Amino acid sequence: MKCAALITEYNPFHNGHVYHAQQARQIADADVTIAIMSGQFVMRGEPAVYNKFIRTQMALSTCDLVVELPAYAALSAGEYFAEFGVKVADYMNADALVFGSESGSIQAFEELALQINHIEEHPEFQIKLREGKSYPRIISELLGEPPLLQTPNNILGLSYVQAILKSAPTIQPFSIQRHKTEHHNQAISDNHFASGTAIRHALNTEDKMWEQVVPNSIHELYAKPHMNTNQLFPYLKYKILSTSSDDLRAIHTISEGFEHRLKSSISTSDNFEQLMNQLKTKRYTYTRIQRMLMNVLLNFKQQDKPTTLNAVRILGMNETGQRYLKQLKQDFPERRFITNVNKTTAPYFKPEIKATEIYNLISGQTQTDFNTPVIRVKNKEK
C-alpha cells in the first residue's frame, strides 16, 4: 500500500484540512493517508482547542490513520518540529510527505533546502545560532532574505524538505498551494474556508459561523468541551513562582537568560495577556514566548529532549489504516506501533502522558492516555 503522510495539528479540523488530505491522496497516488498530529499542546504555544482524542475522531473523517507527534516536537520551533515529524513519517514507512504552502512549488523548496544544508556547515551559521538568533533569521541574514522565506508555511515546508534530505531520502516531498485565508485573521469571511485562528475565535465567542467552514460530518464533535486558554494562567503563574531561576534555565527552549525576565514579570501579571505584554521584545516572537511558557508549565527539560524515535503512538484508524498497520507490523517486527497505553508501553510516552494530565487539570476533562483506547472507525467515502 502506498502511503502519504501529513504533519498536522488540526487545531481544530476544518475544510482546509479536508482539501489537504484529499489532494495528498491524489498527488501522491496514495492508498492510505497518515496524519501525524500534535497532541494536547500545539506549536503556537497553546493547549489544543480540543483534546487529541476528539481531534483524532475529526481527522478520521478524512484520513486513514492518526498518530501522535511527540510532545517535545509539538512545542518546538519549526526545525525540530519538522525533524521529528519526518522521523515519524519515516518510521511509518511513508512514501510521500505532502504539506501545504503559500508557494506550492516543490522544486523551489528542494533547491533552497540543498543550499541551506550546505550553509549550516559554515562557521558563521554556528556563531549566529549560539547568539540565540532564530533559524529563519540566520538564513535570511546569510542568504539575503529569499522570497520563499517570507511566509510561515513556506518556512515550515522548507524545514520538512531539509529534514527529508538529511534523514529520510526515500520519502518524496510534495507541496500543495494553500487556500488564501489569512493565518491570523479572526473573522470568518469565506463561505468554505477559514483559518484555525478564526475558528477558535468563533468557538470562544460562541459564534456559529464556524459551521460553514467545517465538514457537516463532524459538527457534533465541535459540540464537545473545548479548551479556553484563559483557564491556564493560574497554573502557569504558580509554576513560575515556585520554580527557581536555575531550574527555569534548564527548560526546553529557554535561552539567553529569559528565565530572569520570567521571574521578574510574573509577580506583576494578573492574566496571560499582561504577562505576554511584559515578556514581548523585538528579539522574541509572541509564538516563541508562548512555547517557552508551555514548556515551563509541562516542566519539559532540555536534557530530556528526545533525539531518537523509539515508538509511535497510534491514536486512531479506519479499516484502511488498520490494514496498513497490520502490514507495517509484518514488515517491521522490530518497530513499536503502540495502540494502547498501559504499564508496559507507558515509558515510551512519558511527556505525552504528562501533557494529557496537565491538559485535564486545566480543562477539567477526564480522557487520559490510559483510559482511552485506540479509536477505530469504519471506512467512509473519500
UniProtKB/Swiss-Prot annotation:
It catalyses: cytidine(34) in elongator tRNA(Met) + acetate + ATP = N(4)-acetylcytidine(34) in elongator tRNA(Met) + AMP + diphosphate. It comes from the Bacteria. Keywords: ATP-binding, Cytoplasm, Ligase, Nucleotide-binding, RNA-binding, tRNA processing, tRNA-binding. It is found in: Cytoplasm. Its main location: cytoplasm. GO terms for cellular component: cytoplasm. ATP binds at residues 7-20, 100, 153, 178. Transmembrane segments: none annotated. GO terms for biological process: tRNA modification. InterPro entries: Cyt_trans-like, Rossmann-like_a/b/a_fold, tRNA(Met)_cyd_acetate_ligase. GO terms for molecular function: ATP binding; ligase activity, forming carbon-nitrogen bonds; tRNA binding. Its EC number is 6.3.4.-. It holds the Pfam family HIGH_NTase1. Signal peptide: none annotated. Belongs to the TmcAL family. Catalyzes the formation of N(4)-acetylcytidine (ac(4)C) at the wobble position of elongator tRNA(Met), using acetate and ATP as substrates. First activates an acetate ion to form acetyladenylate (Ac-AMP) and then transfers the acetyl group to tRNA to form ac(4)C34. HAMAP family: TmcAL. This is tRNA(Met) cytidine acetate ligase. It comes from Staphylococcus carnosus (strain TM300). The gene is tmcAL.
